[in-house]
């Protein structure tokens, strides 16, 4: 528990969290982050792990999928953040509760695993729109650029007192700084609260470690997907639309980076990149939406284009103008040979483009790119 003087200065969510953690003193918790976690979720989970130690709570961080962004891989390795990738041999029976960070249950397969193991959810802390999907003891769902902002606020309020002489605290501050940097697209979309958080963290973070994380280059796979997006893109009324075929589920981050890249092209205000993600026999059409147009609402655009009941739209961070989306592939899912897969992709590619063209209000004839 935080010291009495610090507790007396607390109010709001940090005081409520202090009370909840105090009531679970001595327990073992599983921290759950999204299946394909980004630096924001990783940094926040790492910070929660350190805060938990103040209450004699041991906590392990779990994810289901894969970390494939070069910066995120370096973040984990350089800062010695221990993450456990789920496998069927893992046994959750020794855990007293679960903590969901950077997800409210819809972006992690582990929610069902924990439910089957009768592990009760204790906390949900996230910066996305409230989904009311998990029934937990404590919620802190804020409209913020990142979950790292929320955890920085906890640190400022005294849930963990950072010390410059503590190497682990230095790594924690560095991780949170990068989480904020990533979610604000290197501060392009940063607001006052982001700069205030960074100003606080800069007193403890290691700038040389941060520089090494930031300067990681794109992987060959990401470059291949960007090249495919450039080759297949269709530009209509300042919208750049590209389908990049089939990808493994763990390579989904390449879709986001390709959309970021297309948005840098001259006279393009909106980029939409999509692919069919394969994970065994399960397939889903996954896409990324980026726009610089202030009057364009990403949620409304996508739901009106594809149908409100047909698509899941989620906030990817970086700005209010960035979204990810998924459309399930049901009985057509699964591989059926090269010819079958080629035909299936053509059908989905044509259908997605047609719906987007209809929403934009243009014909489907290809423009010169």
Residue ranges of predicted features:
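Gly/His-enriched, cation/cofactor- and phosphate-binding structural elements
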Residues: 11-31, 35, 45, 58, ...
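Anionic-ligand anchoring segments at beta-strand to alpha-helix junctions in alpha/beta enzyme folds, i.e.
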Residues: 27-93
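Divalent metal-coordination and catalytic microenvironments
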Residues: 38, 48, 76, 126, ...
